[in-house]
Amino acid sequence: MYDRDPPAATYGWGVVYWDDLLDVLYRNDPESAREVTARSVLWQDQEVRVHGSGGEQTAYFGGYGYSMSRSALLDVLARRALQLGVDVQYGHRVADLSTLPEADLLVAADGANSGIRGQSAAFGTRIEVGLNPYIWLGTDQAFRSFVFSFERTSAGWIWFHAYPSVAGISTCIVECSPQTWHGLGLDVLGRDQGVRLLEDLFKRALDGHRLISRSRGAPAHWQRFAHVTNKTWYHGTTVLVGDAAHTTHFTLGSGTRLAIIDAIVLAYSLQKYIDVEDALREYDRHRRAELHPVQAASRTSMAWFEHVDQYVGRDAVAFAHAMSLRHGGQNPWHHQLHLATQIAAVRTARRAFATGRRWYLARRRGGGKDDQSRRTGRLPCPFGLDQRGNRDG
């Protein structure tokens, strides 16, 4: 395995996931699943805070999820790969495929701007760039819930969503419209000046805590989301996984999770078929079909936040309900549950129910001792998973 970065380097802060990913990991590799569980943080409930001219309003969603630092996840997966005999070579950027030793299969997991994918037009790559600038930061404000915070400024609305990543540190993704970005001068300010301005704008939401621009990698920079699709995920003996194959908007919170599932499905297909091309054909057919609705939801979510000013003028409860509908239709009782969730006693009851659910799922997993892969030597088929990670509700 060639990794273009040095050991322990990562760009970004935290990743989020849900019980379905733990289920998949425990079925396929309980050792790494236990490590991921041990190094993750549980967050419960979601808050939507709106700071407008009328003061602060807060609305609530139920639900829970997990998060961990990106560096911790990479460490778990890299150490597990080494245990399984994988030759991991760090600091090795692949610029020319002809320089690689001959192989039956090349798996390209080099991100949305994949250089390997770019060497062939056969993938039919299409990249659409979103409108809103965003920046991926950290903060020493230790959020316990998943928090959306919207702030009215003289140049328009700016907002972040934040979640705990590791003890004492949270991930904080700031987004705004191009008009607000230019109006606040974020397009011309230096990196440090821009971060200090964001700290001042969000001083209430951050409770005076600081924003952190630099993780183990380079300082954070403003960017626009690249929505990547491909007509096919394989060509010859090269196959795409993760963001090289597909991207999902960060407001959906599923990119890392989907990349891991890609790898598992690819491994299953390779184990199922003797012929590599047959395996790649099945992987491509199943995963592209499963990701089609996910990417559609991603585009819808991205577009919703690009037009957030059409909704944010409502009271916080109505605004949060509109946010929860951005992925598409909901159950008929969704609105009633949303209204009930604004009551503290109902939120307490929902947390108690969620605690019971987590206990049940942990018991069912059983630490992976009787997983199918150990009994049969084959990976359990992961097809048919619910691929969309919906935080809201």
Label each region the model flagged.
Residues V48, L97, A162-Y163, W233:
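A structural signal for short hydrophobic beta-strand segments in well-ordered beta-sheet cores
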Residues Y268-L385:
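C-terminal helical "tail/cap" subdomain of flavin- and related membrane-associated enzymes
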Residues E35-R39, F202-A218, V276-E282, L291-Q295:
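Acidic/histidine metal-binding catalytic segments
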Residues A8-A9, G115-I116, T247-H249:
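Catalytic P-loop NTPase motifs of RecA-like helicase/translocase cores
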Residues D19-W136, A344-R364:
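Conserved N-terminal helical subregion
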Residues M1-Y11:
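Glycine-rich FAD pyrophosphate-binding loop
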